[in-house]
Amino acid sequence: MSERNNRKVYTGKVVSDKMDKTITVVVETYKTHSLYGKRVKYSKKYKAHDENNTAKMGDIVKIMETRPLSATKRFRLVEVVEESVII
C-alpha cells in the first residue's frame, strides 16, 4: 500500500474534453536553468481518465498517476478543484 502514496499528483487546467471519458490537462511548472539559475516556466499535456465525464473545458483539476489505461493515458481524475465560469 505504500506504493500508492508515491504516485505523482498534478494540478492543471482542462484544455480538451471532446473525447469520451478522457480529458487533456495542461500542467505548468517551473524548472531552474542549471547554469544561469533562472526559473523557466514550461508546460506539459497529459491525457487523464474521467470516468463520469465530470470535468469540463477550463476547469482546474487534480490528476493522479495510475496504471496504463490506453496507449497514451497514464493518469486519472481525482477531483475538480475549481469549475470554469461560463459567460
From Swiss-Prot:
InterPro entries on file: NA-bd_OB-fold, Ribosomal_uS17, Ribosomal_uS17_bact/chlr, Ribosomal_uS17_CS
GO biological process: translation
GO cellular component labels: cytosolic small ribosomal subunit
Database matches in CDD domains: Ribosomal_uS17 (cd00364)
GO MF entry, a single one: rRNA binding
Keywords on record: Ribonucleoprotein, Ribosomal protein, RNA-binding, rRNA-binding
Gene3D superfamilies for this protein: Nucleic acid-binding proteins (2.40.50.140)
One Pfam family hit: Ribosomal_S17
Entry similarity comment: Belongs to the universal ribosomal protein uS17 family.
Subunit annotation: Part of the 30S ribosomal subunit.
PANTHER family found in the cross-reference section: 40S RIBOSOMAL PROTEIN S11 FAMILY MEMBER, SMALL RIBOSOMAL SUBUNIT PROTEIN US17M
HAMAP family: Ribosomal_uS17_B (MF_01345_B)
Role played: One of the primary rRNA binding proteins, it binds specifically to the 5'-end of 16S ribosomal RNA.
Entry protein name: Small ribosomal subunit protein uS17
Originating species: Macrococcus caseolyticus (strain JCSC5402) (Macrococcoides caseolyticum)
Phylogenetic lineage: Bacteria, Bacillati, Bacillota, Bacilli, Bacillales
